[in-house]
């Protein structure tokens, strides 16, 4: 059993932040998270290492929210049913919620442990967006009321791991996958109990090293959600058996570290991944890959996002050269400097 103290977990979280920010030049040039409005393609939010920004014109001009100047935001998420509501996870202050498009932020941390400070990801229930799961440095948490109260959902995770990513089954919301620094877990009971599903990943004795395998991203196949992709620090993996057995794919990729995965809902066999080696695209469910980095000044990709309205439009956040946009399925990229809008009224 690999039980860690809060101090050790904080050290691991700090190490993760350092590793993820290798190559950063300026704070505002490191894009930590990208959140796209579910119905209005003009609106998007990004978090950098020093601020949160909002654009109302597809990234041409930006409003900076000063309320986060003293906090480092680690992830952003827009409520898919009430998109004026935004959640921000921070490095040192847990969860903040905003009800008005980014203007006013309030802490929503009741029920979170005192040492839960680093939030990695939020995931919404597919039909009840007030139900949210949070991946944190000390495990998985759940709220049924939009963040008013949180409860731990860690039963079955025998080792205390940093939970880096969570994915919820699009058709059966009782089924969850959690990516941790010790591999992958699945829950068939909305997080009430978890089962380790590491067959085919790196050997168990190596996982006992704690940081031997970080699962940074999990994505479901568009057609068959029993097929799941996992982007890790040791490569890209795929399962066709709900995680009971994993296989390594993308052996031709030049870098093992995968920070993000996107699947095209219109062309289900098309995958995108991002990492320190840039953006790579596969037309055949991960069997073959080509680099898609034309126009990128930095290949260190930290965040990827696909427009929910048009799968040809992609956004890439880099560690070093800011935000980019592609309108041709990643064939070319155009920089989007965080240029201030002349009028920042709501």
Regions found by a protein language model. Name each.
Residues 2-13:
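Bacterial N-terminal signal peptides that target proteins for export
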Residues 12-346:
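Extracellular glycan-interacting surfaces
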